[in-house]
Amino acid sequence: MAAPCFLTLRVATLAALALLSLGSSAAGHIEDQAEQFFRSGHTNNWAVLVCTSRFWFNYRHVANTLSVYRSVKRLGIPDSHIVLMLADDMACNARNPKPATVFSHKNMELNVYGDDVEVDYRSYEVTVENFLRVLTGRVPPSTPRSKRLLSDDRSNILIYMTGHGGNGFLKFQDSEEITNIELADAFEQMWQKRRYNELLFIIDTCQGASMYERFYSPNIMALASSQVGEDSLSHQPDPAIGVHLMDRYTFYVLEFLEEINPASQTNMNDLFQVCPKSLCVSTPGHRTDLFQRDPKNVLITDFFGSVRKVEITTEKISLQWDSQVVDSSSKEDGTAEERMGPLKYAEQLPVAQIIHQKPKPRDWHPPGGFILGLWALIIMVFFKTYGIKHMKFIF
């Protein structure tokens, strides 16, 4: 009896050890997956969007910046991760025929100002000093959280700038300028302080390519709307407000981004081709020698979208359709069939259709000068016929 009992005990012990080893290997595999996720080089995205121009005739630069702002928000980057700097408030300008709006298309249907724009730096707060402080994190202790770039070594950062520039500089509000050397040194400080993982720099200005010539920090990809010696041209003049609505390069970038959704597999090589010389008139440029990855392997959403976090779990969750909940809720909000329809990524407006449709014909109204002239003619005829003594019958 002793031998069979010993054999049974040995078999049970071996089985227990086998189960324990399987469990430990499975747990180890899950731990490896979790460790790989949390040690990945990219866990969050940030955006710094800067318009450096003042005055009404620079309406298009504000529209450029707000268009990019709208796109990154639509793709999932929250306002808490966006630093928006606008040097002028075109929405409240006295010359704006439609107050509290900024339009990027002739048909006046795509209002990029929207109802939930959070401007972090406005008017005279938009300076070279404040911009460099935001990038390097050297802000006063009293600076609110919304005005800080709270990035780290796992952050991918999109920096978009638009305004008036020249060979090696970009003007801020026609009163000061930032040079390509100052910008390159600021990016180097960011790298040394571990404030970014990868950085995408986009600039829409005249001779924009000169602004990234001095970059020397790793993991930077740069795009510009024009080469050295070229002007970056405007697009879509609107007689109603008397200025152009956008710049050509940003217009076609916006048109490209509106076709992107958070699950898109479109890569950076596609972004390089959005505005050829035949459309932009200027020659867009890009620089990738400092970037470690091949642009064809870099998704657009790595910079323009949110990072969707994944939580690893071993528990099984059973999802069952609760007909009672659906029936009770359908009485208030609609039928169950409507709720069971396929869900799509939310879009504020059918932008792709708005961009390509023709402007609406404007209603004709007699000009003010015509009306004044008509009244003057009537008064002259009255004086000619009746004289000044009958003036009291008019007023």
Swiss-Prot record:
Gene Ontology biological process terms, A to Z: attachment of GPI anchor to protein; GPI anchor biosynthetic process; proteolysis
Residues in the Lumenal compartment per record: 28-368
GO MF terms, alphabetically ordered: GPI-anchor transamidase activity
Membrane topology (UniProt): Single-pass type I membrane protein
Biological pathway: Glycolipid biosynthesis; glycosylphosphatidylinositol-anchor biosynthesis
Residue ranges, Cytoplasmic side: 386-395
Pfam families assigned to the protein according to its UniProt record, in alphabetical order: Peptidase_C13
E.C. code: 2.6.1.-
Modifications made to the protein after synthesis: The disulfide bond between PIGK/GPI8 and PIGT is important for normal enzyme activity.
InterPro entries associated with the record: GPI_transamidase, Peptidase_C13
Chief localization: endoplasmic reticulum
Localization in the cell: Endoplasmic reticulum membrane
Binding locations of a protein: C206, S232, S234
Keyword Repeat among record annotations: no
PANTHER family: GPI-ANCHOR TRANSAMIDASE (PTHR48067:SF1)
Subunit structure: Heteropentamer. Part of the GPI-anchor transamidase complex, consisting of PIGK, PIGT, PIGS, PIGU and GAA1. Interacts with GPAA1. Interacts with PIGT; this interaction, via a disulfide link, stabilizes the expression of GAA1 and PIGK and links them to PIGS.
Family of the protein in this entry: Belongs to the peptidase C13 family.
Functional summary from the UniProt entry: Catalytic subunit of the glycosylphosphatidylinositol-anchor (GPI-anchor) transamidase (GPI-T) complex that catalyzes the formation of the linkage between a proprotein and a GPI-anchor and participates in GPI anchored protein biosynthesis. Recognizes diverse proproteins at a C-terminal signal peptide (CSP) region that lacks consensus sequence and replaces it with a GPI-anchor via a transamidation reaction. Transamidation catalysis reaction follows a two-phase mechanism.
The protein, known as: GPI-anchor transamidase
